[in-house]
């Protein structure tokens, strides 16, 4: 079951250490002797790359693997919140709101794998690198006015020039000072590590990690991890195996069912399938026509055709910022509760003047703008065919969604030409820059709505999944939300921005993709997760379940 909760805004060293002690105790009690090195085979979505988290090519899988190899102030929990790691960065505490001030404490005696000391200078170097990027990764870092080292580099004080409530997103997967950026394997292998694991080898589809003997947290963790992009379950029932996948089909579920030594969990993911419209194309710049193109689609039918109604049927999306299953998601769980693996579908309703799918409403809107339905399709009063140019993202999910959407549009008399692009953010850019009318892609959500909302406020960097849409109202909502430190209060403002974007039909959210987590029944303390980092960040707390004696 996926749990919910609010983002942790502060980190107390005592609390983190207490949590770590409790976790270690429970793992140790069920773990084999320390002299026995246990290997975990971990399957994650690939292909892999050698990026740092600040590089544009970084993926959720990249970030998750780096969580095991680099110092972080906060990591992702199973319920999509953030919690302090309590490792090399021992604590991070918000000590003042005016001006916003955060104090980072570095654990003493920490060294990178090349022997160099880890200290506050590494955080300063990371800040200087991050704040200059033309990327949303620079958000927050650009708001830091100064970063001061004290206590022989073991204390770093960040003073902000303006409020930034998402400060717990900063200083994650920090690289050593002077290390090269970029995604090449040569650059990656040249960077030292500092975390619960050290790197042995890395390729496009395989990582090998070994436990860092100097890492004192989680002593019962696996001694070796082999990470691959193969979802094949090991033939040996004694092998320790876990995986995270977005490939949720009848075939994959049946395959898991055939392995009694493997447990599984079907839940929601952090991947939202969506349609976005170009802001200045002749057709899509008109609100009523964006609305018609949105309402004419039967989203539940799209879901049913992709996933069927037996294994898992996601509910029609009710948010452009949140994934279904996140605590702040505005809709109900619908037909996709995170705690069960089989669901029933919910038919779409047809209500005029709402966000619900409504083919009749769409027809009325087209006719209101003098479009005429002919046997060969829709035509304007001047005889121009109603046609759309569509950019489609590269993933299997993108392609499956595009087939369904384009088929429905064609069946409704709308001509469609399709262009496949190399990345999801590039698909968004194609629509934002008015090269196409529509983009169909999958947008990842994170622990905060600010990442999704960046499409509509601030610099339109490529990795913001740019929309090309800017307005004073949306910018004000974004600026207000990101400066509110109370997560409950901030949520209300984020939801207002969310609703405004959907009411203007700049985005037509379709659904949140399901995810499948699998693991050997011999592994204890495994929980379902919304995201790849949410699963991988659990790994250090997993232990081996000892068989119970009978009799």
Regions of interest found by a model, annotated:
Residues 42-97, 105, 128, 192:
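N-terminal lobe/hinge region of extracytoplasmic solute-binding protein
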Residues 169-224, 359:
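Gly/Pro-rich hinge or "lid" segments in bacterial periplasmic/extracellular proteins
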Residues 204, 345, 349-355, 369-442:
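Ligand/substrate-recognition segments at binding pockets and active sites
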Residues 211, 297-342, 358-367, 396-407, ...:
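Detector for C-terminal structural segments
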Residues 103-105, 136-183, 200-201:
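Surface-exposed binding/hinge segments that line
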Residues 205, 212-257, 270, 415-417:
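Ligand-site clamp/hinge motif
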Residues 91-135, 153-157, 283-285:
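Aromatic- and charge-enriched surface segment that lines or borders ligand/interaction sites
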Residues 210-213, 231, 267-292, 296, ...:
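A bilobed periplasmic-binding-protein/Venus flytrap-type ligand-binding module shared by bacterial periplasmic
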């Amino acid at each position: 079951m996926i749990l919910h909760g609010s983002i942790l805004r502060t980190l107390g060293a005592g609390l983190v250490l207490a949590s770590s002690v409790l976790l270690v105790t429970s793992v140790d009690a069920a773990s084999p002797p320390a002299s026995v090195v246990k290997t975990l085979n971990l399957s994650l979505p690939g292909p892999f790359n050698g990026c740092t988290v600040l590089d544009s090519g970084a993926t959720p899988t990249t970030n998750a693997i780096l969580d095991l190899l680099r110092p972080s102030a906060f990591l992702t929990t199973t319920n999509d919140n953030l919690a302090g790691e309590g490792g090399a960065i021992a604590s991070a505490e918000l000590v003042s709101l005016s001006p916003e001030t955060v104090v980072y404490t570095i654990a003493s005696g920490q060294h990178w794998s090349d022997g160099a000391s880890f200290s506050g200078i590494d955080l300063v170097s990371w800040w200087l690198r991050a704040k200059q990027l033309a990327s949303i990764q620079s958000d927050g870092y650009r708001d830091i006015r100064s970063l001061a080292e004290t206590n022989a580099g073991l204390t770093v004080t960040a003073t902000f020039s303006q409020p930034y409530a998402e400060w717990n997103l900063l200083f994650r997967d920090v690289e050593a000072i002077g290390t090269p950026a970029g995604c090449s394997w040569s650059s990656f292998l040249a960077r030292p590590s500092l975390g619960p694991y050290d790197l042995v080898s890395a390729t496009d589809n395989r990582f090998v990690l070994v436990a860092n003997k100097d890492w004192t947290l989680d002593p019962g963790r696996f001694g070796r991890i082999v990470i691959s992009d193969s979802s094949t379950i090991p033939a040996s029932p004694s092998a320790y195996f876990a995986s995270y996948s977005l490939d949720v089909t009848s075939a994959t579920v049946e395959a898991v069912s055939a392995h009694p030594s493997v447990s599984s969990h079907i839940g929601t993911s952090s991947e939202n399938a969506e349609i976005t419209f170009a802001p200045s194309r002749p057709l899509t710049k008109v609100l009523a026509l964006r609305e018609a193109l949105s309402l004419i689609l039967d989203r539940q039918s799209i879901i049913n055709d992709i996933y069927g109604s037996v294994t898992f049927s996601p509910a029609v999306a009710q948010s452009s910022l949140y994934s279904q299953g996140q605590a702040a998601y505005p809709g109900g769980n619908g037909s996709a509760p995170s705690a069960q693996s089989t669901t029933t579908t919910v038919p779409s309703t047809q209500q005029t003047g709402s966000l619900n799918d409504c083919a009749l409403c769409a027809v009325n809107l087209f006719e209101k703008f003098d479009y005429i339905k002919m046997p060969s399709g829709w035509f304007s009063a001047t005889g121009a065919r109603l046609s759309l140019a569509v950019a489609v993202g590269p993933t299997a999910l993108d392609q499956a969604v595009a087939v369904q959407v384009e088929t429905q549009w064609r069946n409704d008399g709308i001509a469609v030409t399709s262009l496949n692009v190399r990345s999801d953010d590039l698909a968004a850019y194609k629509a934002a820059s008015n090269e196409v009318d529509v983009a169909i892609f999958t947008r990842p959500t994170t622990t905060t709505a600010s990442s999704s909302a960046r499409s509509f406020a601030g610099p339109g960097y490529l990795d913001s999944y740019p929309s090309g849409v800017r307005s004073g109202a949306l910018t004000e909502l974004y600026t207000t939300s990101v400066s509110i430190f109370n997560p409950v209060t901030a949520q209300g403002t984020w939801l207002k921005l969310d609703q405004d974007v959907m009411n203007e039909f700049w985005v037509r959210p379709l659904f949140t993709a399901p995810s499948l987590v699998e693991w050997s029944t011999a592994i204890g303390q495994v929980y379902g997760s919304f995201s790849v980092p949410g699963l991988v960040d659990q790994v250090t707390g997993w232990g081996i379940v000892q068989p119970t004696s009978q009799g």
